[in-house]
């Protein structure tokens, strides 16, 4: 029999397990499907004691007890009445007495549980034959029989209905031409047809009378170079010509004396973003910055390595029952059990997870190149992957299209100064940009090289006297230096103005007839004619004879532009027509190609001296004469024509700082700058409206010419530039060969035989079968309906020409014919008198580009091109190495129940117990032995990405793919080096002048002569007017990044970012320290009494005659005194009942209001005690339980803030936090007066964990203060701010997750009356509530007052 203490322990264990099951209450899930039949449970607990048997016969006396020492307990001096002594200690238990006599027959017990099935008996004798059964159900259809013999021929059937018309037949061959039909009658006049296409140009008409003078035509492009005229006699020396084009660089002079140190220039404007510099050296570790605001959730980190095993802790107390353990190892196959009852049909399982990828198949033959796919939409930016190993440098990709201009990135850290990059290849001239504002005068550049001597110019009129310049100090004359290396090209000069139009040259020989010109401009649309009635179409009449040339009709409306015709074959040279009257100067035609070199004619007799010839070819270079004295300054020459742009010069020194220009476009994105220390939390300023750009400032006055500086020494070569940025992905690689066939894996263990499943649902209809064989011809069908009208047949061959028709009406005026061939060259006319000087004409348009010059010297390597667009997707690469083993998948579902075990031995029949009361549902039994392995679990969630595998070895090169389509034209190659000039020939002697012969035909253009030697430097001309803007030069190389500016003030707090995506599961943390041992749990409930043992022998050695009968257990009659045990059990029962069904009282609090509502569904809403963190009930809190909504509401303390003028300030209005600033740093409190703030914070933290929704209201009482909507301005800029529990600010507008709603808005205007605005915030993130503070904006004046009512925070 169990003792009283044992019973209490059992009771307390039951209470503990009940507690554990009570606390783990989540939302009740849906009812699961009926599980398979379980194995037989373990033997149940023994029944209660039967009723006491009758007393047995007294046993024999027991052995004598141990003698006690009573000497110390007696006083020898007293011999009077010895009353009963004190009760001695209970002796040790005597040995078991012999069995008593059997008791009387007990009452018949209740029927026991069915015993285990007995072993199968032997097969009985065969029974008698049974009576005939009922007829069975129809069997399944038998298999089809064998085909029967072929029957005899049937009788002739009746004639069938006509068949439907057949499909149209194939198109027939073209028929022969039919005979000409007879001429039809003339049809009625048709409507006016649409204007036909322009006809071919007619033959030239007779020369018309001279027309009126047209408007002056635009200057035509320059004609081809005329033949070289005869050498004229030497003219008088002209004045100094204009400054010639820059010649090749001269030898560098010797270094001049060092100039004086100039004044410090002002800071120049920020240069363009520099190239990315080399990584700088890691700086020293800075001081620890202040704690920044919490960042967004980071991306999932890789799984950490397992930690070292910790020190073994002390053995813990028994924990609550754990969840199902992982699948155990496969047990050995048990003996086959008896067949179980058939289970119910299972529900259709979910579709299985996608299988693992199969092994790579054998490489197929290369398929044909697919069509180019559409460009996919831009994908979202992926998470930043781990940095891979640095790959080998790829080949240069094709130049991609320029991308869209990116937004300006933050200014990066100043990089180390890069070396001067090599000059790029000269680009094509861009369109002329708008005229820029005049910059400040730059520092004077290095002197340019001497230009070639220009041709002698005409003597110009004397210019106005210039202003006296400042006299510069004479510099010392340096010694003549050795010739230096050829310098870098000088800077590109400005484009000169277009020169004046030259005199009209003689008429050239008639060229070959050119191809058809481009379509002319459309003429003005003529008036639309009246539309006549549409006549019926007559048969085509024969073509009439050509009519006479009609008068020109009005111009028809412009037809649509026809496609450009193919290039016509050149026609034969026409006979020269008679010379026409000299017409007005026509528009300049395009320049003709140069004619071939004519044969050299015989030398004619010496002619009379001709007029002055053009500029002769430069003569050979004479010996360099001694330097002459400085001559007096010549007269200023006329303004010279603009020189050709010089080559690009070296980068000049930085000029003085110019005026600040307009904001430039966003620069290229810089590298990330260093993290600055977090600035102070500024208040949100109101966003100002964007200001418009100011008007451009007036052009500055031209500064005076600087003095000529001394030539500086050549600079050292710069450092090598930084490596270019990595190119984008190269084109898709060819498909690698298939991987080798993997080894065959070991055979898996045979799974257990599954039970036959239920019939599957009907499958979907299969795809349509292939086309069947043609059936036998059907009977003749009914005649079909008439077919639709067929499409027009192909055009017949053109018939023979018809007879001439009547003359047509006058046609419209023909287009202007091509110009007739030029007449023969007229004789040279007499020189006319000089005309009056005309007004200066307007500047002509830019002439056509000149012939390409000789190739310049090879340029230095240009900078890296832009990163091209991503290449097309590469073919599938080789299979990657095996990935890292993923994390274990989620626990699979429980396996199917194992086969039923063999029958156990039949137990002994138990004693019949009395019928007990129906017990409560027992606790779950201990875990049974591991079941057979379950079926494979569903595929687990994808594991975290493994760490990058080591770089695989390069695969074998794949087979050559099919030839790709032709690539785009390559970039223009670099210009080849200039060839050496040939030697100068000797100058021949001048022959005697002969008589002037007749003027010869114009010779072909001579070949271009070798470049002449450099002429002597002419006198400097006057400063020319500023030329027009030259074409935009190429973008200069990026300047050095300027030093970082001073740290700007901290920007305003940005709006809270959106919640980041939920991070992945973090790696398992290290083992924590062992917790302190928990408190001793309450004693468990007493166990059920055991079976009564046999009666022991009677004790001996104690004289019972003294009347000591206090041991109630010695005799059954004393069992009436068990009321203490009964009371204890009753008390425990009531405590367990309270745990199972909490009352919400101070002594029996519930965890949440939900527990009270589930335990007592008929109770009404009100205040109850709850203890969210469980444990000791001393920290229970009082909450309002709203059973209608399921909310647990905790009230603030205090619940209202007095209405008065809380804040006076004359500064600009800003949000002022009530608890932090106005109320002396006291936030809204939610603790009970009897609890410490720490205990309340703990309870609130558990409350947030137990809830998944939260809501709270705040009422803002106002007087002349706006709380939400500003009624005057119609915006929310004066709305209050709220502070949540996790320091998040809740606003009136912005991110919807952090905005509150308004249920009533009475505080919109300053009315002088009290009103209120009720604010509500609901969220699925309970961690944001309760509200701890409020910040009004529209306060601070003497008449502005407010107060608050803080509503309870309610969790659900």
Swiss-Prot record:
Keyword Chloroplast annotated: no
Bias type Pro residues, positions: 317-327, 1083-1095
Residues found modified as Allysine: 78
Domain Fibrillar collagen NC1: 1123-1356
Coiled coil: none
Entry comment on modification after translation: Prolines at the third position of the tripeptide repeating unit (G-X-Y) are hydroxylated in some or all of the chains.
Calcium recorded as keyword: yes
Tissue-specific expression: Forms the fibrils of tendon, ligaments and bones. In bones the fibrils are mineralized with calcium hydroxyapatite.
Compositionally biased intervals (Low complexity): 219-248, 281-315, 479-489, 521-564, 587-603, 716-731, 746-764, 776-786, 797-809, 827-858, 888-903
Subcellular location: Secreted, Extracellular space, Extracellular matrix
Compositional bias of kind Gly residues: 76-88, 259-280, 334-343, 391-412, 418-427, 448-457, 511-520, 610-619, 628-646, 736-745, 787-796, 817-826, 877-886, 976-985
Disulfide bonds: 1153-1185, 1193-1354, 1262-1307
Compositional bias segments (type: Basic and acidic residues): 648-659, 999-1013
Residues binding Ca(2+), per UniProt: 1171, 1173-1174, 1176, 1179
Gene Ontology, cellular component aspect: collagen trimer; extracellular region
Xref: Pfam families: COLFI, Collagen
Entry domain remark: The C-terminal propeptide, also known as COLFI domain, have crucial roles in tissue growth and repair by controlling both the intracellular assembly of procollagen molecules and the extracellular assembly of collagen fibrils. It binds a calcium ion which is essential for its function.
PANTHER family named among the record's database cross-references: COLLAGEN ALPHA-1(XXIII) CHAIN-LIKE ISOFORM X2 (PTHR37456:SF6), SI:CH211-266K2.1 (PTHR37456)
Family: Belongs to the fibrillar collagen family.
Function, as annotated: Type I collagen is a member of group I collagen (fibrillar forming collagen).
Subunit structure: Trimers of one alpha 2(I) and two alpha 1(I) chains.
Protein name: Collagen alpha-2(I) chain
């Amino acid at each position: 029999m169990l003792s009283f203490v044992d019973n209490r322990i059992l009771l307390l264990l039951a209470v503990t397990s009940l507690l554990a099951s009570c606390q783990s209450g989540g939302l009740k899930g849906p009812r699961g499907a009926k599980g398979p039949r379980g194995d037989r449970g373990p033997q149940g607990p023994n029944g209660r004691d039967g009723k006491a048997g009758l007393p047995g016969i007294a046993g024999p006396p027991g052995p004598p007890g141990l003698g006690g020492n009573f000497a110390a307990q007696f006083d020898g001096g007293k011999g009077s009445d010895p009353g009963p002594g004190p009760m001695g200690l209970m002796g040790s238990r005597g040995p078991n007495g012999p069995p008593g006599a059997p008791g009387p027959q007990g009452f018949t017990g209740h029927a026991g549980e069915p015993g285990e099935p007995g072993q199968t008996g032997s097969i009985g004798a065969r029974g008698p034959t049974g009576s005939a059964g009922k007829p069975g159900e129809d069997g399944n259809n038998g298999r089809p029989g064998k085909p029967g013999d072929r029957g005899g021929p049937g009788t002739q059937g009746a004639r069938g209905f006509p068949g439907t018309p057949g499909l149209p037949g194939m198109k027939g061959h073209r028929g022969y031409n039919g005979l000409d039909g007879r001429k039809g009658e003339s049809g009625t006049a048709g409507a006016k047809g649409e204007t036909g296409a322009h006809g071919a140009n007619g033959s030239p008409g007779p020369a018309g009378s001279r027309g009126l003078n047209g408007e002056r035509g635009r200057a035509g492009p320059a004609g081809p170079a005329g033949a070289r005229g005869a050498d004229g006699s030497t003219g008088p020396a002209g004045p100094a010509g204009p400054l010639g084009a820059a010649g090749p660089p001269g030898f560098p002079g010797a270094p001049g004396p060092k100039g004086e140190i100039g004044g410090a220039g002002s800071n120049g404007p920020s240069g363009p973003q520099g190239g990315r510099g080399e990584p700088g050296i890691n700086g020293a570790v800075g001081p620890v910055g202040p704690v920044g605001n919490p960042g967004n959730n980071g991306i999932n980190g890789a799984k950490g390595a397992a930690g070292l095993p910790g020190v073994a802790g002390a053995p813990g107390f028994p924990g609550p029952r754990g969840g199902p353990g992982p699948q155990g190892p496969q047990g050995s196959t048990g003996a086959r059990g008896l067949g179980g009852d058939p289970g119910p049909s299972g529900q259709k399982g979910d579709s299985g997870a996608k299988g693992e990828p199969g092994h790579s198949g054998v490489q197929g033959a290369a398929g044909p190149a697919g069509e180019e796919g559409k460009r996919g939409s831009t994908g979202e930016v992926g998470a930043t992957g781990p940095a891979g190993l640095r790959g080998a440098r790829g080949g240069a990709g094709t130049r991609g299209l320029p991308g869209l201009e990116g937004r300006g990135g933050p200014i990066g850290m100043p990089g180390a100064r890069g070396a001067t990059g090599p000059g790029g290849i000269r680009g094509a001239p861009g369109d002329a940009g708008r005229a820029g504002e005049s910059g400040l005068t730059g520092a004077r550049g290095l002197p340019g090289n001497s230009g070639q001597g220009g041709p002698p110019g005409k003597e110009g009129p004397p210019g106005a006297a210039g202003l006296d310049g400042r006299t510069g100090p004479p510099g010392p004359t340096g010694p003549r230096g050795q010739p230096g290396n050829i310098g870098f090209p000088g800077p590109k000069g400005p484009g000169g103005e277009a020169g004046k139009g030259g005199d009209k040259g003689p008429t050239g020989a008639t060229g070959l007839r050119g191809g058809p010109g481009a379509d002319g401009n459309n003429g003005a649309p003529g008036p639309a004619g009246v539309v006549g009635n549409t006549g019926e179409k007559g048969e085509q009449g024969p073509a009439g004879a050509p009519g006479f040339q009609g008068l020109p009709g009005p111009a028809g409306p412009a037809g649509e532009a026809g496609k450009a015709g193919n290039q016509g074959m050149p026609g034969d040279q026409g006979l020269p027509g008679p010379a026409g009257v000299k017409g007005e100067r026509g528009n300049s035609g395009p320049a003709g190609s140069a004619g071939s070199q004519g044969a050299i004619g015989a030398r004619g007799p010496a002619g009379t001296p001709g007029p002055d010839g053009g500029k002769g070819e430069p003569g050979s270079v004479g010996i360099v004469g001694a330097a002459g004295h400085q001559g007096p300054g010549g007269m200023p020459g006329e303004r010279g024509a603009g020189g050709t742009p010089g080559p690009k010069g070296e980068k000049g020194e930085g000029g003085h700082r110019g005026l600040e220009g307009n904001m430039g476009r966003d620069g290229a994105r810089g590298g990330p700058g260093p993290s600055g220390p977090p600035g102070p939390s500024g208040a949100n300023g109101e966003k100002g409206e964007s200001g418009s750009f100011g008007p451009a400032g007036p052009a500055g006055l031209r500064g005076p010419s600087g003095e000529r500086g001394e030539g500086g020494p050549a600079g050292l070569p710069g450092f090598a530039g930084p490596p270019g940025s990595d190119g984008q992905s190269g084109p898709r690689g060819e498909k690698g060969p298939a991987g080798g066939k993997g080894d065959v894996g070991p055979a898996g263990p045979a799974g257990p035989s599954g039970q036959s499943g239920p019939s599957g649902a009907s499958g979907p209809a299969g795809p349509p079968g292939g086309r069947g064989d043609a059936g036998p011809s059907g009977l003749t069908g009914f005649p079909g309906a008439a077919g639709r009208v067929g499409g027009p047949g192909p055009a017949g061959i053109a018939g023979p020409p018809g007879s001439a028709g009547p003359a047509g009406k006058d046609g419209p005026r023909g287009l202007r014919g091509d110009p007739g061939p030029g007449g023969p060259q007229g004789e040279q006319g007499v020189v006319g008198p000089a005309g009056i000087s005309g007004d200066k004409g307007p500047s002509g348009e830019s002439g056509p580009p000149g012939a390409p010059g000789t190739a310049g010297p090879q340029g230095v390597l240009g900078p890296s091109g832009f990163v091209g667009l991503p290449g097309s997707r590469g073919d599938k690469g080789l299979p990657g190495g095996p990935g890292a083993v993923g994390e274990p998948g989620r626990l699979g579902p429980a396996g199917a129940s194992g086969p039923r075990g063999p029958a156990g031995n039949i137990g002994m029949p138990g004693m019949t117990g009395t019928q007990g009361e129906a017990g409560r549902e027992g606790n779950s039994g201990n875990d049974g032995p591991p079941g057979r392995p379950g079926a494979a679990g569903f595929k687990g969630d994808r594991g975290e990405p493994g760490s990058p595998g080591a770089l695989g070895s390069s695969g074998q090169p794949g087979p050559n793919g099919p030839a790709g389509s032709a690539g785009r034209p390559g970039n223009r190659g670099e210009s080849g080096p200039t060839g050496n000039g040939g030697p100068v020939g000797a100058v021949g002697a001048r022959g005697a002048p002969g008589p002037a012969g007749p003027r010869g035909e114009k010779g072909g253009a001579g070949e271009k002569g070798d470049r002449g030697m450099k002429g002597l430097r002419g006198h400097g001309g006057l400063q020319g007017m500023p030329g027009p803007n030259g074409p935009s030069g190429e973008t200069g190389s990026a300047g050095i990044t300027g030093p970082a500016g001073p740290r700007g003030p901290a920007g305003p707090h940005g709006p809270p970012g959106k919640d980041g995506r939920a991070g992945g599961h973090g790696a398992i943390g290290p083992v924590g320290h062992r917790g302190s041992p928990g408190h001793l749990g309450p004693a468990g409930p007493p166990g059920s009494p055991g079976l009564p043992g046999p009666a022991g022998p009677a004790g001996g050695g104690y004289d019972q005659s003294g009347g000591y009968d206090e041991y109630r257990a010695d005799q059954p009659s004393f069992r009436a005194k068990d009321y203490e045990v009964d009371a204890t059990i009753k008390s425990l029962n009531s405590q367990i009942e309270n745990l199972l069904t909490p009352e919400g009282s101070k002594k029996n609090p519930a965890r949440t209001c939900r527990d009270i509502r589930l335990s007592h569904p008929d109770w009404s809403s009100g205040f109850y005690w709850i203890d969210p963190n469980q444990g000791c009930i001393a920290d229970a809190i009082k909450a309002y339980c709203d059973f209608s909504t399921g909310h647990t509401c905790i009230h603030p303390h205090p619940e209202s803030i007095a209405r008065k003028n809380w804040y006076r300030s004359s500064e600009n209005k800003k949000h002022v936090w009530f608890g932090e600033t106005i109320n002396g740093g006291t936030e809204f409190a939610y603790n009970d007066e009897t609890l410490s703030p720490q205990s309340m914070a703990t309870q609130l933290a558990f409350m947030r964990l137990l809830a998944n929704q939260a809501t709270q209201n705040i009422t803002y009482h106002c007087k002349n203060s706006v709380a939400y909507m500003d009624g005057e301005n119609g915006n929310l800029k004066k709305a209050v701010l709220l502070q949540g529990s996790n320091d998040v600010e809740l606003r009136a507008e912005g991110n919807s997750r952090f905005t509150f709603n308004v249920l009533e808005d009475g505080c919109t205007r300053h009315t002088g009356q009290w009103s209120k605005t009720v604010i509500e915030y609901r969220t699925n993130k309970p961690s944001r509530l309760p509200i701890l503070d409020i910040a009004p904006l529209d306060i601070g004046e003497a008449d502005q007052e407010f107060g608050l009512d803080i509503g309870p925070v309610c969790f659900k």
